[in-house]
Amino acid sequence: MITYTKPLSKLIGHFEKFPGIGPRTAQRLALFILKQPESTIREFSKALLEAHSNVGRCKKCFNLTSEDECEICRNTERNQKLICVVAETKDLLALERAREFKGVYHVIGGLISPMDSVGPELLEIRSLVERVSKSEIDEIILALTPSVEGDTTSLYIGKLLAPFTKVTRIAYGLPMGSELEYVDEVTLARALEGRTKLN
């Protein structure tokens, strides 16, 4: 078993907490950090603290932003009557890369998962219903991961929003359990085009 000095071991341990980072990658990152000049480390630390302090959630759609409303919600050229519901900001970014969607978003912050003790009350679903009920919305597009949790969440939201507007779900050319952030732009564009009606 490899033994590290305590400060290095602690640094590696912090990197291992990052999603998708295993022990080897954590070690590589820690060793890379140690090779950098102190000025670079100070700039990096400052950037981390600034992002953590100044980036919050859009009061309208819950996307990440440093303003009250995110850039997408403020954009008057976007179709404000077309809302795409995603689980996380990373899914929003994946759809934006596809350059197909011209509406706005609502980030619910996860998926309903009883096994993980995540119920609807822990997600931004109530705020979505309020947003739709108070506005003239032509269509809600559900772009949630094709999984048991994604299906459960889509059906739940679909039932809540059915009295207010048309609800559709994007078509998928990918296997169950796939993460939207890893899907290529062409597949995502086709998924948006081929969406199906839920209500």
From Swiss-Prot:
Coiled coil: none annotated. A zinc finger (C4-type) spans 58-73. Belongs to the RecR family. InterPro entries: DNA_Rcmb_RecR, Rcmb_RecR, Rcmb_RecR_Znf, TOPRIM_dom, TOPRIM_RecR. Keywords: DNA damage, DNA recombination, DNA repair, Metal-binding, Zinc, Zinc-finger. This is Recombination protein RecR. It holds the Pfam family Toprim_4. The gene is recR.
